[in-house]
């Protein structure tokens, strides 16, 4: 804890933006939801892991379904599963290709990697460029599905809900035990010499 300093946390510029801005010296400390690559560390960046947070498969509150499995999620983004259990048409939302959300899904959901590449190349679904935009779009779009972190869900209680994944609820116990496998690792990113204010 430091006294005498004012901490300002601006709106999210995303992991890619935070890494770029930190590397270029525009900000002293960035927040990222993935670890640095070897190329990024070679450019003089360092990281400190500070938290893990659940990644929710989230839907607009109009969706009656409560659970998805890996196969159903892949089918939705492949355009093969087109309706919810009440017959309403699925509206799938994507994050832009370089977003850390996609890295997590490709590692943890078998088959999602090839479907994502095809989906983005064909521009099949609406693509969002920030977590805030994803959350707002989910909240106002009936029958929509997308991806948001656990902290964001609290902002739209009653408008957006998390689905169970493979029958497992996203909560602290299941994240800690590894039963719920979709989670973001959060890092502070900084240049080799950290300012006193940033420390």
Walk through the language-model features, giving the residues of each.
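Exported/periplasmic ABC-transporter solute-binding proteins
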Residues: 1-199
């Amino acid at each position: 804890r430091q006294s005498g300093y004012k901490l300002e946390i601006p709106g999210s510029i995303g992991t890619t933006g935070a890494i770029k801005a930190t590397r270029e010296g525009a900000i002293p400390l960035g927040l990222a939801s993935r670890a640095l690559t070897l190329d990024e560390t070679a450019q003089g960046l360092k990281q400190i892991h500070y938290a893990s947070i659940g990644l929710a498969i989230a839907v607009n509150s109009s969706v009656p379904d409560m659970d998805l499995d890996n196969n159903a999620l892949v089918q939705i983004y492949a355009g093969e599963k087109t309706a919810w259990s009440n017959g309403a048409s699925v509206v799938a939302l994507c994050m832009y290709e370089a977003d850390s959300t996609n890295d997590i899904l490709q590692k943890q959901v078998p088959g999602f990697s090839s479907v994502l590449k095809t989906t983005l190349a064909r521009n099949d679904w609406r693509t969002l460029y920030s977590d805030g935009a994803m959350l707002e779009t989910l909240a106002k779009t009936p029958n929509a599905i997308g991806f948001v972190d656990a902290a964001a869900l609290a902002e739209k209680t009653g408008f957006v809900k998390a689905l169970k994944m493979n029958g497992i609820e996203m909560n602290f116990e299941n994240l800690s035990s590894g039963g719920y496998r979709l989670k973001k690792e959060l890092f502070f990113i900084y240049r080799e010499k950290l300012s006193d204010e940033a420390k």
